Amino acid sequence: MTTLDSNNNTGGVITYIGSSGSSPSRTSPESLYSDSSNGSFQSLTQGCPTYFPPSPTGSLTQDPARSFGTVPPSLSDDSSPSSASSSSSSSSSSFYNGSPPGSLQVAMEDSSRVSPSKGTSNITKLNGMVLLCKVCGDVASGFHYGVHACEGCKGFFRRSIQQNIQYKRCLKNENCSIVRINRNRCQQCRFKKCLSVGMSRDAVRFGRIPKREKQRMLAEMQNAMNLANNQLSSLCPLETSPAPHPTSGSVGPSPPPAPAPTPLVGFSQFPQQLTPPRSPSPEPTVEDVISQVARAHREIFTYAHDKLGTSPGNFNANHASGSPPATTPQCWESQGCPSTPNDNNLLAAQRHNEALNGLRQGPSSYPPTWPSGPAHHSCHQPNSNGHRLCPTHVYSAPEGKAPANGLRQGNTKNVLLACPMNMYPHGRSGRTVQEIWEDFSMSFTPAVREVVEFAKHIPGFRDLSQHDQVTLLKAGTFEVLMVRFASLFNVKDQTVMFLSRTTYSLQELGAMGMGDLLNAMFDFSEKLNSLALTEEELGLFTAVVLVSADRSGMENSASVEQLQKTLLRALRALVLKNRPSETSRFTKLLLKLPDLRTLNNMHSEKLLSFRVDAQ
């Protein structure tokens, strides 16, 4: 967005505001030092503010008081609570939000009204214009960390990332206006502002403007001036000339993120996998809900022991006798699997998300290895479909006869077990408890995609807003997976078998600091398994667990509550139909919902505590 300001004094101000809407709006030197950017446009709301046609980086606005305008409130980041809260806590180039680092603020040199902050000896000029800091609006001293910034904001950002400073929580809902005179009041909001305008540890760190960047900015400014001069005569009042449609570089305010338990994995893939909300469909009958959910549950969920050919008990017997377990084609066609425990957790998380999105195709980046032992960790192997298998257990093959694609068809004695989950605490000696817990959480990653796909097939789920869809998935995925994998907890033997076909005792895992959470998981699994739910009942209960109207951050709780009631009616009808004599069975099933919420909170707190300790 570009704004122009003209007055009777010499010079004037031209302010280029990043299309992401993250730079403060200023239309006069006085507003450069105002305590709140909101005041600059609140005083100009009367008259006929009209928008210029879009420029290469945004649109121009007209101010009736000075024949030029200011940025509409909806596009000013300091006026939108969502802008400050939507930025992440890690410095990454993803914070450009479609706005190139060259989107800038400049001011015509006017020493009587624009002065650098204290300690600033260098003023970055471009053809007689003074560049302004994208964070606070002070005079920029150069091109620092990917944007034009003043010495104060450059040093502040450098200290923040080098010392990994955790700033105190903002007392104003992370909605502080960051300008020159108050930039030190709230350090958390200032750091988020740095990230939102595009500052990154991976970006340019030196003060000189690259030649290509300088040429691009000059062309951008000249084009904006030409548009302003040519279009002034044809401007109309706002009531008769609608605002132009936002360009690809303009980003409107996004809803504030909903506080939710620490997610198991990165959920950035949800918006891509979910569909936009559609027009409300007719409310389905109870029979339709039961049949649709049961079918989705039966066809979508594959990461469960009942789909792997053997039950936990049978597997333990086979494993004790040395016979490899049987596997089904569904298991072989896994669409992505965890990396080995030897990988860095963050890198593993990135690979998981890429695998879930189908971004990584073809052979693995790891060289294939074939250990000769009875059970080893091995590297990822591509199967014939291009999907990678993660062989947690590799049963030895005759020497020199290893198949090229890592899969020997028709020979159950020499088979790679594709593991949808890969929890292996003993994969490397000397591993910390934090690393083991990270692997424990990461082990759920491959099943997340199935949860998303299952949600899309719940009648009425896609009628919800995309924000509410994502919020429900973020908050409820762990609970859904807990229901899915409850059968993997053997209460009698006090063991848990992960889908890697590796069994661990409760005592063994409890010694690693997992006792409280695992005890709660065992108790829940015992209670849920005692109800002996059918496949249809389990599918409907899974849908009820996911669609919970009391999740924090919902936009339209009424719609979610209505969908939840529909699912509850269907579940009640099905339970009473299957066992009409057990009238308390439905009530007992509903009592598992608060137990799941407790487990979710326990897992989030445990994972968060380990992450804090690891820093």
Swiss-Prot record:
Residues 49-285 are annotated as: Crucial for activation of GJA1. Residues 285-615 form the NR LBD domain. The modification Phosphothreonine is found at T275. This is Nuclear receptor subfamily 1 group D member 1. One of its GO terms (molecular function) is sequence-specific double-stranded DNA binding. Composed of three domains: a modulating N-terminal domain, a DNA-binding domain and a C-terminal ligand-binding domain. Residues 14-34, 72-103 have a biased composition (Low complexity). One of its GO terms (biological process) is negative regulation of toll-like receptor 4 signaling pathway. Ubiquitinated, leading to its proteasomal degradation. Ubiquitinated by the SCF(FBXW7) complex when phosphorylated by CDK1 leading to its proteasomal degradation. Ubiquitinated by SIAH2; leading to its proteasomal degradation. Rapidly ubiquitinated in response to inflammatory triggers and sumoylation is a prerequisite to its ubiquitination. Sumoylated by UBE2I, desumoylated by SENP1, and sumoylation is a prerequisite to its ubiquitination. It comes from Rattus norvegicus (Rat). Belongs to the nuclear hormone receptor family. NR1 subfamily. GO terms for cellular component: chromatin; cytoplasm; dendrite; dendritic spine; neuronal cell body; nucleus.
